[in-house]
Amino acid sequence: MRSAASTDRGETESDPLFGGVSGAYLGSMLVPPVIPLIERVGVTEAGTLYLALIGTVGLVTTVTGWVLSSRPPVAVTLGATRARWLPSAIAFAYAVIGFASLETTGVVGVLAFFLGLLAFLLGGAIAVMAQTRYTAAVTAGTEEVTRWRASWPESARRRRLYVGGAVVGVAAVGVAVGAVFDLALLQYTGQVLFPSGFVLLPTGGTRTAVATERGLEIRLPVARWFYAWNELESYDLDSESLVITRRWGSDLRFATADIDDVSLVEWTLAERLSDD
């Protein structure tokens, strides 16, 4: 659980991006169960069925987007908790169920699998956007103590490169073997893992860390993350890396050589965290 933090920010602005992505997520999830309902009322011709599905997705996306766009606090509230990852988890389970039911559900199962994977990606985008909006709200008006900009330490870069390369390699082999021996499960698994490996391959990303009285903010090109000081346990600083240990989740790692004022950063952390 995150500690309570004030988010007394102007929240009257509309947020069409968050609303639109959320609407697309919900629309993708609703398509498979809608098919039997449409067929039950007598719509069986492929073209008509396709138009009905497009209309359903469009309607759900539009309505959901309109409702959430005018309610920015929804994104802020979601971003304050780990429940922001729930949409992705639900969509992944949805895709798995769709795949497992292919033999009995036919086209509905196929759509559930592929649209579930699409919704999984959209759910991840929802989580990142919600976290970014929460971070913007909780850090608005706070006094900045210090900031630094640094990339990953060399050892962490190598680990990410090795793990990402291994995932890509295993996924490629899985797709090839699945195609040769007609193993659908192996093929689909490889197709899902292949792009996941590429997520780990980039190792040169530089992040900006901003220390405030409320906590530590991490700024990426497309996202912002906030950690209250009570969510961070300790820090360790040496000539290669600065490692900030979180109570839950992966550690925050920075290359020491990239930090302009190491002494100020160390003082800031020492005032608030224990030194390993």
Label the predicted regions.
Residues 140, 230, 234-276:
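Acidic, Ser/Thr- and proline-rich intrinsically disordered linker/docking segments
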Residues 138-150, 213-220, 262, 271:
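Short, highly charged, low-complexity non-transmembrane loops/tails of multi-pass membrane proteins
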Residues 1-206:
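Eukaryotic intrinsically disordered, low-complexity regulatory linkers and tails enriched in Ser/Thr/Pro
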Residues 206, 222, 255:
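Short, flexible active-site loop motifs that bind/organize anionic cofactors or intermediates
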Residues 179-187, 214-224, 258-260, 272:
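Short charge-dense sequence patches
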Residues 211, 216-218, 224-242:
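Phosphoinositide-dependent membrane-docking surfaces
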